[in-house]
A protein has these predicted regions:
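A feature for loop-to-transmembrane-helix boundaries and adjacent hydrophobic helices
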Residues: 1-270
Length: 270
């Protein structure tokens, strides 16, 4: 299966790049649309999105390179070839989160309210971005048979794409993409519930994606490892714990319901 969507001779456009860009555009559109309802300062919003995209991509790449250092120390120029794949979403989330917390604090914007807006677009972006993994033939699971994939009603073009180096593999990218899309629907519908507390959507995202990634990662055969541990599963457990705190423990302490779309602004509520 070709990774190249368009070959212009002087430049090649990869499917991976296309889906990453689609993911970024989709998330940006949703975040801007939702932010307008909260009267977020335009300059703050543009600057935040701009830097989060940059730092998120850098963080995702750095995270991947660190855990594949044995390869990249021998092929240093490949560090910059992100179109070949190798963006670890956990790295992007961690670095992006650090920047958002810093920038919200600097501008006196409620970080949790802003994150409640961001996570809705983020999980949709993750669902789209996983298709870049498909065309790069990465993020796949254990060896299986063609008949088993047919029995699971996997589309033929995906079955063909999961034929790698003489074997068929489980399309774990597809499982995660579907679960991310379902998570998006849940977050999107939940966001307007009249009895939400600030941080609940952020917590729900952390729990949903943490559980999703933990189980999908258990099926993958190309995981980033930290000794005997699958690093993504370690981070997923931490996400679930943080999500439980924001959804339940923190909310129990807060007696006030603060629905995003009934408050009319997110400033000065850090």
């Amino acid at each position: 299966m070709s990774r190249v969507a368009l070959d212009l001779g002087f430049i090649k456009i990869y499917y991976y790049t296309i889906f990453i860009l689609l993911a970024i555009v989709s998330a940006t559109y949703l975040i801007i649309k939702e932010s307008r309802k909260q009267n977020i300062d335009k300059d703050f919003l543009i600057n935040t999105i701009y830097y989060v995209i940059i730092f998120g991509i850098l963080g995702a790449r750095l995270y991947y390179v660190i855990f594949e250092w044995d390869y990249y120390i021998k092929n240093p120029l490949e560090i910059f070839a992100i179109w070949h794949g190798g963006l670890a979403i956990h790295g992007g989330i961690i670095v992006g989160l650090i920047f958002i917390l810093y920038y919200c604090h600097k501008n006196k914007v409620s970080n949790l309210k802003f994150l409640d807006i961001v996570v809705v677009g983020l999980i949709l972006a993750q669902a789209i971005g996983r298709w870049g993994n498909f065309f790069n033939q990465e993020a796949y699971g254990a060896i299986t048979t063609k008949q088993e994939l047919i029995n699971m009603h996997i589309p033929q073009f995906i079955i063909n794409g999961m034929y790698i180096d003489g074997n068929y593999y489980q399309p774990t990218f597809l499982y995660e993409s579907i679960l991310d899309l379902l998570g998006f629907v849940i977050l999107f519908l939940t966001r307007c519930y009249p009895y939400l507390k600030i941080g609940f959507l952020t917590g729900l995202y952390l729990i949903w994606y943490g559980v999703t990634r933990f189980f999908v990662e258990g099926m993958r055969s190309d995981s980033l490892m930290l000794g005997p541990l699958k690093m993504a599963q370690v981070v997923s457990i931490m996400m679930i714990i943080c999500g439980i705190y924001f959804c339940f423990i923190r909310n129990i302490k807060s007696k006030k319901f603060e629905n995003l779309y009934q408050e009319g602004g997110i400033r000065h509520e850090v």
